[in-house]
Swiss-Prot record:
The keyword Coiled coil applies. It comes from Drosophila melanogaster. Residues 423-456, 458-491 form the WW domain. Residues 22-37 have a biased composition (Basic and acidic residues). Plays a key role in the Hippo/SWH (Sav/Wts/Hpo) signaling pathway, a signaling pathway that plays a pivotal role in organ size control and tumor suppression by restricting proliferation and promoting apoptosis. The core of this pathway is composed of a kinase cascade wherein Hippo (Hpo), in complex with its regulatory protein Salvador (Sav), phosphorylates and activates Warts (Wts) in complex with its regulatory protein Mats, which in turn phosphorylates and inactivates the Yorkie (Yki) oncoprotein. InterPro entries: SARAH_dom, Sav, WW_dom, WW_dom_sf. One of its GO terms (cellular component) is apical part of cell. This is Scaffold protein salvador.
Length: 608
């Protein structure tokens, strides 16, 4: 027992507060941690993983005031280089860019073992490094695999270096032009023995790609055999200025040198004079086609400007293949409006428009050589027929074309448009045609559009039907009243008779097997189920009582259909009461009239 009490007394408490732990650590010292003796006393040891979140906001504040940020190496013992500010020194390192950094500063390589210099509120301007020193610094950077650089600070300083306000040492002369393209290259470290040649290879590829990109628009339009002579490669290239900054390399182009280079062709054609003449003739033919097409289209449709809602190549290819495919009756009017292209005589001439016969995409500006081609005038009229809705139905256009050429015929769906049996339009209605020639109806009264005629079967009132008889023709019959008429029921009230002075006579309906319903109100309005039920006595008492007693009733005990039934019963009671009141006054009025007539008769008898 004594042994257990001794153990419990000597045992230290397991739950210590954070403050007691810190005091014990200060008293006993740091145990189990190794610290180098050559670490300068002015640099504090900061745990990056614990202070990363706390220092992130301070880093953003420091990045917003980027002129006060500088690059300083910590020391030779610690191989981590950071961008420090005057007020604080953040240690926020970008994980993905830890091994992909720009070349170091010149003074950091000349003095690798120097202590950090005091920071200044302005950005230091460093002279550019020559290419051989830049490659050496990139080699040293690739061999050092433990460099950590703040990536956000690098991006902000890189934008400052690329801005025209801070470019003082490597900016071109004022007369050279204002075109400068600066970019920064970021090297990725791989193995130590591959770090030295990566920048040279990337720089060569980038310069070659920029040269090709600038030379692409200068290629001739027509294909020919080209050869690259060796003396052509010795011409002065685009004036490039390489300047290595503490954050990357900058490539700049001179406008004067670019203008000289652009005037020179990339390749010298080795074609004969005959081929050169043919090329010139082809270019003249293309220019002539453009001018003729613009003249025929009136300046509204050029070779490279079309409305957004239509594809010109699809339109032309559709017109070229109209005779090979079948159209639906809805869009059959399009065939008639575009069939004029097949009637125009075809020629192989340079001033005509090339229309491909296949299903591929065609163009309004063709080469003019070979293939089936129609006239530009025919194409312009077909394009205008698409975008301008015709004021007359397409059947009239088809009829005019058929009379002139003798090869066009009416489509059956178009014949129905001109038939005299078509129903007349009510007042306020009009017809119009779509871009494809389909007819639709406009209701100016309601500001709506409809595909169907307003007086068709869908527009019949309730109880009416359309009857087609061999004896009497087409007429409309009212199933409830037995009335029959030729005019549409909706058109009867405001129909204007233009064919004859008298309206048409009523037609006797034929005997049909259909029997009209006996109760007319059932077809129009559903019957109220509470019209014939007996009214409860308590509801009659409630109708005669004062409205101040309504709180005595518990309406929550009834369902919604029952309440609706009680409401209809109350309406019945109120109508009965109204009839009683009106009947009383009507009897009194009739009694007054009788008494008045009696006295008037007596006065007449006395006067006689």
């Amino acid at each position: 027992m004594n042994y257990l009490t001794i153990l419990l007394c000597n045992r230290k408490p397991t739950m210590l507060s954070r403050r007691n732990k810190e005091k014990s650590q200060h008293k006993e010292g740091v145990v189990g941690k190794y610290m180098k003796k050559d670490t300068p006393p002015d640099i504090s040891v900061i745990n990056v993983w614990s202070d990363q979140r706390a220092k992130k906001k301070s880093l953003q504040r420091c990045a917003s005031t980027s002129p006060s940020c500088e690059f300083h190496p910590r020391s030779s013992s610690t191989s981590r280089n950071t961008y420090s500010c005057t007020d604080s020194q953040p240690d926020y390192y970008h994980a993905r860019r830890a091994q992909s950094q720009m070349p170091l500063q010149q003074h950091s390589h000349s003095h690798p073992h120097s202590l950090p210099h005091p920071s200044h509120p302005h950005v230091r301007s460093h002279p550019p490094l020559p290419p051989h020193q830049f490659r050496a610094s990139s080699n040293q950077l690739s061999q050092n695999s433990s460099n950590y650089v703040n990536f956000e600070q690098i991006e902000r300083m890189r934008r400052q270096q690329s801005s025209p306000l801070l470019q003082t040492t490597s900016s071109p002369a004022p007369g050279a032009g204002g075109f400068q393209r600066s970019y920064s290259t970021t090297q990725r470290q791989h193995h130590p023995h591959l770090g030295g040649d990566s920048y040279d290879a990337d720089q060569g590829l980038l310069s070659a790609s920029y040269a090709n990109m600038l030379q692409l628009p200068q290629r001739p339009h027509s294909p020919a055999h080209y050869a690259v002579p060796p003396q052509q490669q010795q011409h002065p290239q685009i004036h490039q200025q390489h300047a290595s900054t503490p954050f990357g390399s900058t490539l700049r182009f001179d406008r004067a040198a670019m203008s000289i280079r652009e005037r020179q062709p990339r390749y010298q054609p080795t074609s004969s004079p005959m081929q050169q003449q043919q090329q010139q003739q082809q270019q003249q033919q293309q220019q002539l086609q453009h001018t003729q097409l613009a003249a025929h289209l009136g300046g509204s449709y050029s070779s490279d400007s079309y409305p957004i809602y239509e594809n010109p190549s699809r339109v032309i290819s559709m017109r070229a293949t109209q005779s090979q495919r079948s159209e639906s009756p809805i869009y059959s009017n399009t065939t008639a409006s575009s069939a004029t292209l097949a009637v125009v005589p075809q020629h192989h001439h340079q001033g005509h428009l090339a229309v491909p016969s296949g299903s591929g995409g065609g163009s309004l500006s063709g080469s003019g050589r070979g293939g089936s081609s129609g006239s530009v005038r025919g194409a312009s009229t077909s394009v205008q027929s698409l975008y301008v809705p015709p004021r007359t139905p397409p059947s009239a256009v088809a009829g005019a074309g058929g009379s002139a050429n003798g090869s066009l015929q009416k489509v059956p769906s178009q014949q129905s448009l001109t038939e005299p049996e078509e129903l007349p339009l009510p007042p306020g209605w009009a017809t119009q045609y779509t871009l494809h020639g389909r007819k639709y109806y406009i209701d100016h009264n309601a500001h709506t559009t409809h595909w169907n005629h307003p007086l068709e079967r869908e527009g019949l009132p309730v109880g009416w039907r359309r009857v087609v008889s061999k004896m009497h023709g087409t007429y409309y019959e009212n199933q409830y009243t037995g009335q029959s008429q030729r005019q549409h029921p909706c058109l009867t009230s405001y129909y204007v008779y233009t064919t004859s002075a008298e309206p048409p006579k009523a037609i006797r309906p034929e005997a049909s097997l259909y029997a009209p319903p006996t109760h007319t109100h059932n077809a129009l309005v559903p019957a109220n189920p509470y019209l014939l039920e007996e009214i409860p006595k308590w509801l009659a008492v409630y109708s005669e009582a004062d409205s101040s007693k309504d709180h005595l009733l518990q309406f929550n005990m009834f369902s919604l259909p029952e309440l609706e039934g009680f409401d209809s019963m109350l309406v019945r009671l109120f109508k009965q009461e109204l009839g009683t009141i009106v009947g009383f006054y009507e009897r009194y009025r009739r009694a007054l009239i009788l008494e008045k007539n009696r006295r008037a008769g007596q006065n007449q008898n006395q006067n006689q």
